[in-house]
Amino acid sequence: MPPLSRRELLAASLAATTVSSLALARSRSQPGKKRDWHAGEFRRMVALGESTTAGGWSTNASRCWVSVLGQMINDFQSTRMDVINNGIGSNVISTRSPCYKHSGKPAANERLQKHVTDLKPDLLIISYGLNDARGGTPLELFQAEMTGVIRTIRKSINPLILIPSPYFMTDFRAGGQPWTKANLEIFHEYGKGIDTVARAENCLFVDLLEASGHASWTVHFDGIHQSDLGHRIVANRMFEVLATHCTGLARHTKLIEKGAPRWRNESKLKADYGY
């Protein structure tokens, strides 16, 4: 058989690429192929984090993202999930963080037993990065410490773990000199680094910086914490990630939707135009 010309080789290569692309598109469009991260309803959610997790300066406890997320999940479950907020202001990931001495203690890696494993959650949110970035923790050290926290937890329990990026904030001079070592670019690098840890450690990642749209009016007047609106955006994005990865959040809806009463009535709207 004579060798193929350059034109024939190019045509064959393009044809193979087209077939491969079509096959990939078909596989992506086929239902039922996506991984299900949690097939049952959640029983207990624990949020481990810093001041925004604790509530920041939301106008009341029910407007904190932890409470809002818990309400959203419970709205779609037949059985109520317990919600436990273990946020501490100025908290950091580890005793090895350079800003540890200025932080709210104990650090995350010091408080895993009483604040996580003893509680036996099946949904765990570990929200760190904002204070470590502001306090000068090198990203590589932060990633190593976050990985250590996740692996320590999984020696005892195996919850679904969700880890978000830092929250959006506007005043990188606030909080005093120990907390002035970050900017928005560093926050985005942290977000990428946290995503890398999530992929390596079998966790779900939530990009809160992207969710914020960099809208300054979602931030509290102190320039650091989320406003009530910001807390709602955080909860919404976390719920979106959970709902699109966990079939357990659809179980109750799937059970009741076929027998639900048909409540829609557009007859007046049609009658307005003679139909």
Residue ranges of predicted features:
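Acidic/histidine-rich helix-loop elements
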Residues: W57-S58, N86-A107, R134, G223
